[in-house]
């Protein structure tokens, strides 16, 4: 049976994912050794976790697929947010480097605008936490310029950016 274990975990992860049990799906996906599907699940569900205040869970998931953060810009952005929300402020900028590299060589699309807005918002949050009002305002304004109203996660970040502008 040991040879069948990865396949059983893979099947369980698909079932859990299809039935809305994301945490269980990711746990089984990681146990199956399917890093690519784990990354996809994390990218697809990371924003919801952050909006529910589960930044620590998100950080644990991202650390389980650490090798992919360099090649997946959204994973890098989620990692930066997880660091910020868990108080690891000194690790936020380095987490954003892969996303910076990706976006600098990408065509402007809705996806890249959301990424740029998310990066500006986490930088605004970081500057605000450090008491740098000038940088917080600049990044918050930048975030508002990129983030669309029609995407739920982007709306949350727009609210954060607006709040930072009100605090500064």
Sequence positions of predicted segments:
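Short, glycine- and charge-enriched coil/turn segments that flank and shape catalytic ligand pockets
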Residues: 1-4, 104-110
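Extended alpha-helical scaffolding segments used for macromolecular assembly and cargo binding
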Residues: 2-76, 82
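Hydrophobic core segments within long, regular secondary-structure runs in both alpha-
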Residues: 6, 10-13, 39, 55-63, ...
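Residue-level detection of beta-strand scaffold positions
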Residues: 13, 29, 76-78, 92, ...
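Alpha-solenoid helical repeat architecture
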Residues: 21-23, 35-36, 71-74, 107-118, ...
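Amphipathic alpha-helical segments of tetratricopeptide repeats
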Residues: 26, 46-47, 59-63, 67, ...
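Tandem amphipathic alpha-helical repeat scaffolds
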Residues: 39-48, 74-89, 115-132, 156-168
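Short alpha-helical linear motifs
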Residues: 51-54, 63-67, 82-86, 99-102, ...
């Amino acid at each position: 049976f040991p040879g069948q274990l990865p396949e059983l975990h893979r099947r369980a992860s698909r079932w859990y994912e299809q039935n809305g049990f994301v945490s269980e799906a990711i746990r089984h996906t990681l146990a199956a050794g399917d890093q690519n599907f784990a990354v996809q699940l994390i990218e697809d569900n990371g924003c919801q976790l952050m909006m529910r205040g589960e930044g620590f869970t998100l950080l644990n998931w991202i650390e389980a697929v650490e090798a992919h953060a360099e090649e997946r810009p959204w994973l890098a952005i989620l990692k930066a947010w997880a660091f910020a929300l868990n108080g690891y402020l000194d690790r936020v900028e380095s987490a954003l480097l892969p996303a910076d590299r990706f976006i600098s060589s990408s065509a402007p699309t809705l996806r890249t605008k959301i990424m740029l807005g998310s990066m500006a918002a986490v930088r605004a949050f970081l500057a605000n936490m450090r008491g740098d009002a000038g940088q917080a305002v600049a990044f918050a304004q930048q975030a508002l310029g990129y983030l669309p109203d029609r995407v739920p996660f982007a709306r949350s970040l727009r609210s954060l950016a607006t709040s930072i502008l009100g605090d500064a």
